[in-house]
Amino acid sequence: MADGWGATLPQGYLAQTDPRQFLMNMFASKSQDFLVSTPAGVGAIAEADWQRLFPDEAEGWAYYRAVEAAPPPGFRFEAIAVSRGGRLVAAAPLFHVTYRLDTPLQGRLRPIGDWLHRTVPRVVAHPVMGLGSPLADRCHLGFDPDLSHSEREQALTALLQGLDEKAAREGVRILAIKDLADREAQPIDGVLQGAGFSRIAGLPVSVLDLPFTSEADYIRSLSANNRSVLRRKLKTAGPVALETVTSIAGLEDEIYSLYEETRANSRFDYGDFEQLSPRYFRDVVAALGPERAALILARVDGRLLAMKLLFIEKDRIIDKFWGMRYPAGREHNLFFVAWMEGVRFALAHGARRYQSGQTAYAQKMKLGSRLDPMWVYFRHRWPVVNRIFRRAAPLIAFDKMDPELADIRKRRSG
């Protein structure tokens, strides 16, 4: 059976009862030149080495170094690296968290999950070791671009074996890969599933393509109804003063409180994965600098009511985090006002895409966005429990449990 790299996997690998044996067999049949290590974080890897695997990304080495210095509550960060002959050939950020298995339950099902957690916490909450980061829009699992297809397979096999051995040493039973982008998951899905990982649909990322020459051109691209709604929201917003800044000196606490207020008013609750360190905005803006980070601030009568953190790349603007005061922000339609300012910012920078995260899907689709799929992989290190996980996986996909995504799927299928 061939995987996406054109390499041949052992016959019957999907029927492996012990993924650890699969990894050892795969690794034994390949080159033994790979060395796996677990640095204290991405920041402990040489910047040039990391940038070679992930060139021109705002969520790059400087970003990870900043967030690793002050992780959000409940998380511990490391990295995992594979080298050969002293050269980094594969790497990924690594996180540790006590994960609630009921996290996908949202909307009307959320009280059931909370009841289970209160009643049987040891059944619901488990230590997890995962590739990726709660603070990145996708899992940065990367490979040296000079590797051949078969060498990538070898490097990935070594990385997975190193991850399993680390989990065994630390007594962690659940392994995960958070938010692997669809285009990056396809070539390695066979290897991951052969190693015992199951996959479920994660929360997709909203992306607005920008083949437009102006703000007016963008608005004309919307449907008549959505165009009318957007124009009305902008017209009735009132006297909103907008400012784009690259320094938040003196505003750090206020900006963090805007984010926290928005999180508290959300209809959804993804627990630890939504939390930020109080130092996040200060540290990240300072680390990335004005070439990589900016904030849109919205004030009414001098009072700061909303903020939007943007990351800057050559062809993409990442609308990273949004915060707003309630109810004043809604009264002034600040979601729409700040959205348009973000689109203007992206157009002014010549960006081809405006990426706006994993929230407010229905509204963002009305504003022209599409949804890029993301995948979550997981494996229990006990084979019997892992088989149960594999069977249960389709039932707990995030796109089924998230009420907004479920409604979008229903409308599409209907």
Where do the model's predicted regions map?
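Short, Lys/Arg-enriched N-terminal segments with co-localized hydrophobic residues
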Residues: 13-24
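Active-site/acyl-donor-binding loops of N-acyltransferases
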Residues: 22-33, 96-97, 138, 180-182, ...
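A conserved beta-strand-loop-helix scaffold within acyl/acetyltransferase catalytic domains
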Residues: 26-110, 174-330
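Acyl-donor binding region in acyl/amide transferases
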Residues: 75-78, 83-84, 89, 96-198, ...
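Hydrophobic alpha-helix feature that most strongly marks membrane-spanning transmembrane helices
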Residues: 260, 264-267, 286-289, 303, ...
